[in-house]
Amino acid sequence: MDALEEESFALSFSSASDAEFDAVVGCLEDIIMDAEFQLLQRSFMDKYYQEFEDTEENKLTYTPIFNEYISLVEKYIEEQLLERIPGFNMAAFTTTLQHHKDEVAGDIFDMLLTFTDFLAFKEMFLDYRAEKEGRGLDLSSGLVVTSLCKSSSTPASQNNLRH
C-alpha cells in the first residue's frame, strides 16, 4: 500500500463523532465571533472588571461573579448551539473536548476554559481591566514597517508611469 492509499484509507475512517465535534467547534467559532456574544461578554465584564485585583488572594466576591458568568455565558452558548445543532448535549461535548483539546483553536479553548477554570476566568478579567485602564500590552514601539520594494530617490508623487 503506498502513502496515498494509506492517507485516503485513514481519512475514510474518521468517525462520525469526530465530524460532530468539528461541527460543534465550527459553530462555537461563529457564536464567539458574533456581535451579540461579544456585546454580552463585554457588558458583563464592564459591570465587574473593577472588582478584580492582580493579587494572589481571591476575594469572596469573585465566586458569585464567576457563577453568574457561567450561568449567563454558558447558557447563551448552549442555547445558540441547540438552535444550530438539534439534540446538542453540552455535557457530552465537554467530555469529548477533553480528548480533542489539542485540536481546538486557542481562542475557543481559552474561552471554554473560563467556564471551568476559575484562574482562567480571573485572568480574563485582569487582562480586560488592564486594557480598560490603558495598561495593556503596547507593541507599537517595537514595530517597524519596512518596504520590500527597492528604495528610490524620486519622491512617490513624481513616480508616474509613462508610456
Curated annotation (Swiss-Prot):
The record's Gene3D superfamilies line, in alphabetical order, gives:
ADP-ribosylation factor-like 2-binding protein, domain
- Where would one find coiled-coil regions in this protein? none
Q: List locations, semicolon-separated.
A: Cytoplasm; Mitochondrion intermembrane space; Cytoplasm, Cytoskeleton, Microtubule organizing center, Centrosome; Nucleus
Tissue specificity of this protein: Ubiquitous with higher expression in brain, especially in hippocampus and cortex. Also expressed in lung, cerebellum, liver, kidney, spleen and heart (at protein level).
Tell me the InterPro entries matching this sequence: ARL2BP (IPR038849), BART_dom (IPR023379), BART_sf (IPR042541)
Q: What Pfam families does the annotation carry?
A: ARL2_Bind_BART
Q: Which GO terms describe its biological process?
A: maintenance of protein location in nucleus; positive regulation of tyrosine phosphorylation of STAT protein
GO cellular component annotations of the record: centrosome; cilium; cytoplasm; midbody; mitochondrial intermembrane space; nucleus; spindle
Task: List the keywords (alphabetical).
Answer: Cell projection, Cilium, Cytoplasm, Cytoskeleton, Mitochondrion, Nucleus
A single Gene Ontology MF term assigned here is: transcription coactivator activity
Role according to the record: Together with ARL2, plays a role in the nuclear translocation, retention and transcriptional activity of STAT3. May play a role as an effector of ARL2.
Family according to the record: Belongs to the ARL2BP family.
Subunit note: Interacts with GTP bound ARL2 and ARL3; the complex ARL2-ARL2BP as well as ARL2BP alone, binds to SLC25A4/ANT1. Interaction with ARL2 may be required for cilia basal body localization. Interacts with STAT3; interaction is enhanced with ARL2. Found in a complex with ARL2BP, ARL2 and SLC25A6. Found in a complex with ARL2, ARL2BP and SLC25A4. Interacts with STAT2, STAT3 and STAT4.
Name of this protein: ADP-ribosylation factor-like protein 2-binding protein
